[in-house]
Regions:
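N-terminal Sec-pathway targeting helices
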Residues: 1-26
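Short, ordered beta-strand-loop transition motifs
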Residues: 67-68, 87, 144-149
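Intrinsically disordered, low-complexity regulatory segments enriched in Ser/Thr/Pro
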Residues: 83-95, 188-190
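Exposed beta-strand-loop-beta-strand "reactive/processing" segments of non-cytosolic proteins
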Residues: 58-85
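Extracytoplasmic/periplasmic C-terminal soluble domains
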Residues: 139-242
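Non-cytosolic head/periplasmic domains of membrane-anchored proteins
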Residues: 93-171
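Short, non-transmembrane alpha-helical segments in secretory-pathway proteins
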Residues: 31-64, 104-117, 171
Length: 242
């Protein structure tokens, strides 16, 4: 072996010793995580990362994954994004657009509800996930339009009005929405004044118990421009004890 070859061999061996020593120190300082933790971490990221990437690409950098794997909006701090995987399109669909248009949708729908119920509170949230071709430029009126995948918009209407006229109220609401060509899932709850006043505009579903013991009557229906369907039997109304 030449002197140059011996020199290279010495350098290689020294480097190998240094790398092994460094690796030993690293293992001592940072021992490998238990296998079950590595598996849990892999499953967490394999479940949440594709959803985050989809949402960020579509709407912008305003989402985070929680420790439980849910996707939360940083713009609407109390909102968790609901997504579904479409096998046909090989992509996700979501309800986030409804929240982006929440204020505009409520500005359209609240005046209609007030003409029928008088004093009332109306909140908008998503129902069906929107088609993949809907984007952040989709308008409120497009969300209210008829679609095979819809309805996309769901509303909760709370009112302290006397429920004796509930059938007439629902008929008027149906006619008003049908006249505009809206496709909506509508929930109506007649409450006592005390319960009604406790309903908060934000995060009301978590802050107020509006179960059977809190409402007087509760009805749900899907209203389309040319059809009406009760979601709770033929009569459609559930009587509470509130």
């Amino acid at each position: 072996m030449t002197k140059r070859g011996k020199g290279r061999l010495v350098i290689f061996l020294c480097a190998a010793v240094i790398l092994v020593a460094a690796g030993s120190v690293r293992v001592k300082l940072h021992p490998p995580r238990p296998l079950h933790e590595q598996i849990a971490d892999y499953m967490y990221h394999s479940r949440t990362d594709p959803k985050l990437e989809y949402l960020i690409e579509k709407y912008g950098d305003e989402f985070v994954a929680t420790e439980y794997g849910s996707i939360q909006s940083t713009r609407f701090s109390d909102f968790y994004v609901y997504l579904e995987w479409s096998e046909a399109e090989q992509t996700y669909t979501d309800t986030y657009l409804v929240y982006l248009r929440k204020e505009e949708l409520e500005s359209i729908l609240v005046p209609i509800a007030e003409t029928i119920f008088g004093e009332c509170k109306l909140f908008v949230y998503g129902y069906s996930t929107c088609p993949s071709n809907f984007g952040k430029d989709t308008t409120a009126l497009e969300l209210l339009s008829v679609s095979e995948e819809g309805p996309f918009v769901q509303i909760d209407i709370f009112t302290p009005k006397d429920p004796k006229q509930r059938n007439e109220d629902m008929q008027k609401l149906t006619e008003a929405f049908q006249e505009q060509g809206y496709f909506i899932y509508a929930n109506i709850k007649y409450l006592s004044s005390e319960t009604y006043n406790a309903v908060e505009e934000t995060d009301y579903r978590h802050g107020v118990n509006i179960g059977r013991d809190a409402y007087k009557y509760f009805g749900s229906a899907i209203i389309a421009p040319d059809s009406f369907e009760w979601m709770r039997g033929d009569d459609g109304w559930c009587e509470g004890t509130g």
